[in-house]
């Protein structure tokens, strides 16, 4: 009985040693309760100090002790925090030092990726260690940059052979003459000389690190049936890579023109001060010179001032531009020119704007514009001196309404000239002589004119009748009386207003009878022995 109790007590002591502080307290309280003598509870401050001592004994030393004891042998994981200094220059220098150290560490741990065309895998190579010297700086802009073409060993991949076909890739992404190598004409020339097949693949990347497996950098894919042709193709490609093609940009645009007139001190400045005063390639940028020639006329109703200045379809302005090599535009109020900046006409009076780089050309154009404006002033004065037709004038051209009397007289004269050619004109009787009475139709009494009536009636005779063709049925040819001629026949201008046109014939009925006699006589003269018409 006593042995079993001793064994259990021994186990309790062993387990108590392996338990933590918290379980030890709980067991001590439990034992004290069993014995009936309860120990007093410890304060929070005492337990906190005991906990710190427990951590310092069982684990690493406290954080503060790392820096206080130099003999402990622990190296600091982080550098101590520098105390702020009152000197701004020292603080800036320290910040710059820290930035430089971080950049050096970043460069040391960086890696670059290169694409292998033959294997199609991505390989990563670590950069140089921090102790390696920094790469050389790029050449300064003062000296000309020299493009050294890469060697063929650096840009060609391994030869892939299979089924009697040899394939190889040549990377030209960073080659200066890549734009010439990818041309169809260049590829055809290399194919004809070497007997291989060339294909341009990939895409151009200014930064080759952005290339992917799907879109590799720009390269040439060579397919050949023997190694000899493949070697010839590589030699041709190398010759194109090393060929000096001259400047890729036309440098003549950036060269300053040697013009003595421009360097003249009396000539105005023709260089703009855009930005730093220089254009591309450090050369001054040229500026358009302007000259305004005012017209000094106000647009008036009925006088087209703009049309008079520019001419039909701008012919006057175009002539000045061709003669002087300048640009001439009409601007201002009433010019219909919309300013791009304000989207409306300018507030200035109407004028001609001359623009050019050459001041002498502007002066020549100014003289021609002044002559044109002087001519327009004369046209305006001539238009203003005609107050009756002012509202109907168009510039210097007046609109004259048609004269009806002249129009009808001209029409009568034109139609008189176009009478039938087969009708011969009959002689006219003197107006002072009385008209003789002749029997026009056999068996019919002759019609006598009233006494005292004279007329310029042409009496046709049988000898004057036409032998061929029938005349018009609306009047005898050559017969004219005041107011009796049909439109287009007779002598114009003999109609007297207010007078009966049939008074000379004794009335309208007598005229109709006379007309029928004339028609019958003409028909009888043509037909010969024709019977009387029914």
UniProtKB/Swiss-Prot annotation:
UniProt xrefs under SUPFAM superfamilies: Eukaryotic type KH-domain (KH-domain type I)
Biased composition regions of type Low complexity, renumbered to the chain: 263-272
Pfam families the record matches: KH-I_KHDC4-BBP, KH_12
One function term, GO molecular function aspect: RNA binding
Domain of life where this protein originates: Eukaryota
S-S pairs: none
GO CC field: nucleus
Basic and acidic residues: bias regions: 8-67, 252-262
Compositionally biased residues, Pro residues: 130-141
Disordered: annotated segments: 1-150, 252-284, 383-434
Biased composition (Polar residues): 102-113, 393-408
InterPro entries, alphabetized: KH_1_KHDC4/BBP-like, KH_dom, KH_dom_type_1_sf, KHDC4_KH-I_first, KHDC4_KH-I_second, PRP5/DDX46/KHDC4_KH, RIK/BLOM7
Biological process annotations from GO: mRNA cis splicing, via spliceosome
PANTHER family reported for this sequence: BLOM7, KH HOMOLOGY DOMAIN-CONTAINING PROTEIN 4
Protein name in the entry: Uncharacterized protein C30D11.14c
Organism from which the protein derives: Schizosaccharomyces pombe (strain 972 / ATCC 24843)
């Amino acid at each position: 009985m006593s042995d079993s109790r001793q064994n259990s007590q021994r186990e309790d002591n062993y387990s108590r040693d392996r338990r933590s502080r918290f379980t030890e307290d709980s067991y001590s309280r439990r034992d004290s309760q069993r014995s009936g003598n309860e120990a007093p509870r410890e304060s929070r401050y005492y337990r906190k100090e005991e906990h710190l001592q427990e951590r310092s004994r069982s684990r690493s030393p406290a954080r503060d002790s790392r820096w206080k004891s130099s003999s402990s042998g622990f190296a600091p994981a982080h550098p101590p925090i520098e105390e702020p200094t009152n000197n701004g220059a020292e603080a800036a220098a320290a910040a710059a030092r820290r930035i430089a150290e971080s950049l050096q560490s970043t460069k040391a741990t960086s890696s670059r990726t290169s694409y292998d065309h033959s294997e199609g895998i991505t390989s990563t190579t670590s950069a140089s260690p921090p102790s390696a010297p920094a790469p050389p700086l790029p050449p300064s802009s003062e000296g000309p940059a020299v493009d050294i073409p890469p060697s063929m060993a650096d840009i060609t991949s391994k030869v892939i052979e299979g089924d009697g076909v040899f394939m190889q890739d040549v990377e030209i992404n960073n080659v200066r003459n890549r734009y010439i190598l990818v041309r169809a004409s260049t590829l055809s020339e290399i194919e004809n000389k070497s007997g291989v097949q060339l294909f341009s693949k990939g895409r151009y990347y200014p930064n080759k690190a952005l290339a992917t497996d799907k879109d590799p950098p720009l390269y040439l894919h060579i397919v050949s049936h023997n190694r000899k042709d493949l070697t010839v193709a590589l030699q041709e490609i190398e010759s194109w890579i090393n060929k000096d093609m001259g400047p890729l940009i036309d440098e003549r645009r950036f060269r300053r023109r040697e013009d003595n007139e421009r360097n003249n001190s009396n000539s105005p400045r023709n260089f703009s001060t855009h930005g730093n005063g220089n254009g591309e390639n450090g050369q001054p940028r040229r500026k358009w010179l302007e000259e305004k020639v005012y017209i000094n006329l106000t647009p008036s109703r009925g006088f087209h001032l703009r049309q008079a200045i520019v001419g039909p379809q701008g012919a006057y302005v175009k002539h000045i531009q061709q003669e002087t090599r300048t640009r001439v535009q009409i601007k201002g109020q009433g010019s219909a020119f919309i300013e791009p900046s304000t989207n409306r006409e300018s507030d200035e009076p109407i004028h001609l704007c001359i623009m050019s780089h050459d001041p002498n050309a502007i002066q020549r154009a100014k003289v021609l514009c002044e002559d044109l404006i002087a001519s327009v002033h004369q046209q305006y004065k001539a238009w203003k001196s005609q107050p009756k037709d002012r509202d109907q004038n168009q510039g210097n051209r007046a609109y004259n309404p048609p004269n009806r009397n002249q129009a009808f007289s001209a029409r009568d004269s034109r139609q008189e000239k176009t009478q039938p050619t087969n009708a011969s004109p009959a002689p006219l009787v003197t107006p002072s002589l009385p008209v003789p009475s002749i029997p026009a139709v056999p068996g019919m009494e002759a019609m006598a004119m009233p006494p005292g009536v004279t007329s310029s009636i042409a009496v046709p005779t049988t000898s004057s009748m036409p032998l061929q063709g029938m005349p018009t049925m609306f009047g005898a040819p050559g017969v004219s009386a005041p107011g009796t001629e049909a439109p287009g026949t007779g002598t114009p201008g003999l109609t007297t207003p207010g007078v009966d046109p049939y008074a000379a014939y004794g009335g309208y009925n007598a005229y109709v009878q006379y007309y029928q006699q004339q028609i019958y006589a003409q028909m009888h003269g043509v037909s010969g022995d024709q019977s009387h018409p029914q």
